[in-house]
């Protein structure tokens, strides 16, 4: 272990990564697997079969209350009113001057309840921004970082593999559902991802992450680290905060005008 890593946060799957021989590196305050067998074979596995990523370092913010939709409409760039009750939507969080604080996915969990997934490096900043702008809205904002582990199962065979473990039907693209998965209850399954492949992302209680990870890898899902996650997203031109987006660069300049709905009156 490199000097100083004892201060880094660890995901619930850390011991499994170490046992699998993963190369662990500091990333956004976490000790994360950058690769297992190697970036190239992991990249190919996702493009041709199925890979599984531990993305539990990503943050979660829950927003609820009578004004939850109106509040998110104010701070997020996309049209939050268009998110179906089981839907998901990509957007950006902007400063007053239009600089990008983060790019995010928001899931509608109910008529007045939403879950927004933040980038790991921006979670505390995003949470503070949410709370700062909640004044005047009948809304509650809660940090859910430690309430969820998050796995991404991606590739042409991803849905078929997850379906073997699921008690119920998987959601379509940009939709969500809650299922029991490999005996793990109340898993939020979202038809989203960061690879350009079909697949799902799983948000579940941290104590069940190991059970689901084991069930997936035992059935052929290849563990994939952050290295291949980056090459996969780069290959399909998905944005990376800190490279393509920053507080000094607006969403229009970054090519994200499609998710900025000016008629909603969002900040930025």
Language model region names:
Residues 1-94, 99-101, 227:
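Acidic, proline/glycine-enriched N-terminal capping motif
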Residues 1-34, 109-267:
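Conserved, structured C-terminal
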Residues 41-45, 99-102, 131-134, 184-187:
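Short hydrophobic/aromatic-rich motifs at helix boundaries and adjacent loops
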Residues 55-66, 107-115, 153:
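N-terminal glycine-rich flavin-associated loop
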Residues 79-133:
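Well-ordered mid-protein domain cores that form the structural environment of catalytic cofactors
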């Amino acid at each position: 272990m490199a000097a100083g890593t004892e201060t880094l946060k660890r995901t619930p799957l850390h011991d499994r990564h170490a046992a699998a021989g993963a190369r662990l590196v500091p990333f956004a305050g976490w000790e994360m697997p950058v690769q297992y067998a190697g970036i190239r074979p992991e990249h190919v596995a996702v493009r041709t079969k199925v890979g599984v990523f531990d993305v539990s370092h990503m943050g979660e913010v829950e927003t609820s209350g009578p004004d939850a939709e109106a509040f998110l409409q104010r701070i997020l760039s996309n049209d939050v009113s268009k998110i179906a009750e089981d839907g998901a939507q990509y957007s950006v969080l902007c400063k007053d001057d239009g600089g990008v604080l983060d790019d995010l996915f928001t899931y509608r969990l109910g008529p007045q309840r939403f879950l927004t997934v933040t980038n790991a490096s921006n979670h505390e900043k995003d949470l503070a921004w949410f709370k700062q702008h909640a004044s005047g809205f009948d809304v509650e904002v809660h940090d859910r970082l430690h309430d969820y582990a998050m796995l991404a199962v991606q590739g042409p065979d991803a849905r078929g593999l997850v379906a073997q473990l699921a008690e119920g039907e998987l959601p379509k693209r940009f939709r969500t559902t809650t299922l029991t998965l490999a005996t793990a209850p109340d898993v939020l399954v979202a038809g989203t991802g960061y690879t350009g492949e079909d697949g799902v992302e799983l948000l579940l209680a941290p104590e069940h992450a190991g059970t689901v990870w084991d069930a997936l890898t035992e059935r052929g899902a290849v563990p994939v680290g952050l290295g291949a996650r980056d090459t996969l997203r780069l290959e399909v031109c998905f944005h990376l905060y800190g490279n393509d987006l920053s507080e000094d660069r607006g969403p229009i300049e970054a090519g994200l005008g499609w998710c900025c709905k000016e008629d909603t009156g969002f900040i930025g």
